[in-house]
Amino acid sequence: VEHAQRGRRVVRLKGGDPYVFGRGGEEVQALQAAGIAFEVVPGITAASGCSAAAGIPLTHRDLAASCVFLPGHLADDNATHDWQALARPGQTRVFYMGLQRLTQIAQQLMAHGLAPETPAAIVYDGTRPSQTVMATQLRHLVARAPGYGPRPGLLIIGETVQLSPDFQANPADA
């Protein structure tokens, strides 16, 4: 804001969609409050890019009529997701920044009724040449994840994950 007020051109480059867990809305509010003209160039959010690159549809006529994007952590540490609603069938759940709370996410979903056999995947370094997909069942997710290291990852949970080539490659191991 300070640089723009001094007449300089300012670019805020954000990977993905700046309005999906990117704080774009907060930044726009600050610019509007300061009376600074701006332009937002939309990007492709990680959920869309990573799922497509991994061969995981977010929706499917027979498997998931909806998808929901969630932060793995909430701004207020005392806040919580509606786990009962998230455990309902027929949806794909995509958690951004959720790997540090992977155990809690898996436990809460299963405790609220999501089947332990539900397909789940972590897409590491999505859409990059180094992309890796770890696909398994929800009940095995926590045990299998540590072997993949502390890279950035997007967590996808739902029946559409079974369509991923990575899930299909080892269905008995999944």
Predicted regions located by residue number:
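A contiguous loop/helix-start segment that scaffolds small-molecule binding in enzyme catalytic cores
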Residues: 5-11, 23, 29, 66, ...
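Short glycine-cluster motifs
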Residues: 2-73
